[in-house]
Swiss-Prot record:
GO terms for molecular function: membrane insertase activity. Belongs to the OXA1/ALB3/YidC family. Type 1 subfamily. This is Membrane protein insertase YidC. Interacts with the Sec translocase complex via SecD. Specifically interacts with transmembrane segments of nascent integral membrane proteins during membrane integration. It comes from Mycobacterium bovis (strain ATCC BAA-935 / AF2122/97). The chain crosses the membrane at residues 3-23, 28-48, 106-126, 191-211, 237-257. It holds the Pfam family 60KD_IMP. The keyword Ribonucleoprotein does not apply. Keywords: Cell membrane, Chaperone, Membrane, Protein transport, Transmembrane, Transmembrane helix, Transport. It is found in: Cell membrane.
Length: 366
């Protein structure tokens, strides 16, 4: 095990990558054997699965961000149409729209950006198992020196087991067009390497194609109509899978296995996450319908109206006035028999001057 850590290099990437791969290798080597081809192949594949499991939550955010971006496409097109000539104003309005909806485009790129250093780290670690070729950033060692030198977390014994691991003469660390460093492998057969590598390479290209196709099929019509999105869809469907097939002969067999397993994981995880999000959205719609149904009145029932109550002061005033008027009228009625004999007093009494409730007072003639 190499314990020399260089703080001014990318060792902070190389050591974690080699450690995760070493843990899985020790587990599968215990079952299959230390020099078994599939023990090393599974260690590379489970390195991918470990990374993708750690990036599960950012991947879910990426999917949600992508769907949110598709939902905002009509508003984005409206802003582009309105402020197409004013780039600065359009950028400000776009930022405002993103803030209003809590949209962060960086979250959509996080899983992809996180995989780049891991891919570079794995490529460097696999390349460091065979230092007999030299090259950029690598010492030029002899075959014996190479087997006596550790590779980050891997011990010199592990390095020897990696160089000995092959499938029908196809070493896992070799590539089809390799010309130098062949002496480091115990058994190397180029026809066997091509026979093993080409099917894996084609499977990796097919997995890339179906992964891109599944992702494009879930795009909205507005997003697919965007010229930039349409161009990226064509690249993802045809150029990227073809790039895997064309570039495969120049990459170690372990890297092709890495690419194949990464696309298989992405395909399954994408299907699961999209299904989960669709179920959540369907549950929200059903909950909204249930709430509207609970708040709606029963069929044929009249809506209940709260009774209107008059102010107490307005209700009390007529009552009091009525009481006083009734009292005055009763007093006048008791006095009327005594005044019947004198018409002058009957006309000049208080009962003649006070009008009854609701009767307009008579105007006096001047």
């Amino acid at each position: 095990m190499s314990l020399l850590f260089d703080f001014f290099s990318l060792d902070f990437i190389y050591y974690p990558v080699s450690w995760i791969m070493w843990v899985w290798y020790r587990l599968f080597a215990f079952v299959l054997g230390p020099s078994n081809f599939f023990a090393w192949a599974l260690s590379v594949m489970f390195l991918v699965f470990t990374l993708r499991a750690l990036l599960y939550k950012p991947f879910v955010r990426q999917i949600r961000t992508t769907r949110q971006m598709q939902e905002l496409q009509p508003q984005i097109k409206a802003l582009q149409k309105k402020y197409g000539k004013d780039r600065q104003r359009m950028a400000l309005e776009m930022q405002k729209l993103q803030r209003e909806h809590g949209f962060n485009p960086i979250l959509g790129c996080l899983p992809m950006l996180a995989q780049i250093p891991v891919f570079l780290g794995l490529y460097h670690v696999l390349r460091s198992f065979n230092r007999t070729t030299g090259g950029f950033g690598q010492p030029h060692l002899s075959v014996i020196e190479n087997r006596l030198t550790g590779n980050y977390v891997f011990s010199p014994v592990d390095v020897g087991h990696f160089l000995d691991a092959n499938l029908f003469g196809a070493p896992i660390g070799a590539y089809m067009t390799q010309r130098s460093g062949l002496d480091a492998f115990v058994d190397f057969s180029r026809p066997a390497l091509i026979a093993v590598g080409v099917p894996v390479m084609i499977l990796a290209g097919i997995a890339t194609y179906f992964n891109s196709r599944a992702s494009i099929a879930r795009q909205s019509a507005e997003a697919a109509a965007n010229p930039q999105t349409a161009m990226m869809n064509k690249l993802a469907l045809y150029v990227f899978p073809l790039g895997v097939v064309v570039g495969g002969p120049f990459l170690p067999l372990a890297i092709i296995l890495y690419w194949f397993s990464n696309n298989i994981w992405t395909f399954g995880q994408q299907h699961y996450v999209f299904g989960m999000i669709e179920k959540e959205e369907e549950a929200k719609k059903q909950e909204a319908v249930r709430r509207r149904a609970a708040n709606a009145p029963a069929p044929g029932a009249k809506p209940k109206r709260s009774p209107k109550t008059a102010p107490a002061t307005n209700a009390a005033a007529p009552t009091e006035a009525g009481d006083t008027d009734d009292g005055a009228e009763s007093d006048a009625s008791t006095e009327r028999p005594a005044d019947t004999s004198n018409p002058a007093r009957r006309n000049s009494g208080p009962s003649a001057r006070t009008p009854r409730p609701g009767v307009r007072p008579k105007k006096r003639k001047r």
